[in-house]
Amino acid sequence: MTNLEYLNLVMSTDFPLDHYDSEYLTKQFNNLKYKEQKSLSNTGIALIKHYHPSIWRCNIKNHLAPINAWNDPEIMLKVINNRLKYLKTDVLSAYNIRSGLSISKIAPKVSIFRPAMAKYLINKYLNEFEVIFDPCCGFSGRMLGACALNKKYIGQDINSITIKESKQMRNDLKLSADLCCKDSLYDSGEYDCLFTCPPYSDKETWHQDIEILSADEWIDVCLKNYKCKKYLFVVDKTDKYKDFIVEEIKNSSHFGTSNEKVILIKRDS
């Protein structure tokens, strides 16, 4: 097919979403739960893409959301040209082209917290606790990691759509999780431990009105609003809490490399 033929195909095709049968989804979770995983493994990502189609409606700052870019012929022709050039093939699937939106950086997908990374961090820093509280639960990566370790997960998020999607995942996979839609900025509570990856300022948009805070400001909020024995945060940068960094996560992708900071804070008894 020619570039223009691919473009015509895209323009006549709905945005490709991920759909898997229950057997495959269960196998994905069992792999996360029972098999040893590297922290940067993509195991469990398919679960997130299946249950959270709303990720494709969200966008990186100054970029279109992938699902909106799909309907723009000028953008999609650039993506198709990019895919044909770098894949060195003249046979593309709709999913190849969708991936090209992120790889070409034209309309990249928002970030997903790897379930394998969540499992690794909980096991390393919070394993003495049976219940994990997450005030910014997002697209369920930390829920999957916690439940893969047979922990109970309590998660909340300001976005009602992602909570609805997470509840469907919980119900289908029979996960031990309590989920609710709540604004953590105006909440309080007491838990054994807290584990979250708060929004990175205004780098990503989820089509809702939220207050824009820095990572340090989010940590301040969590320490003020929630009384816990331990707090575990993954953030892109910190000035105020540098002394509490216990490790860095090095990510490599088509966008280059980045280092996320893992911050562990223990509350004095």
Residue locations for each model-derived region?
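Class I S-adenosyl-L-methionine-dependent methyltransferase catalytic core
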Residues: 1-46, 51, 55-69, 74-269
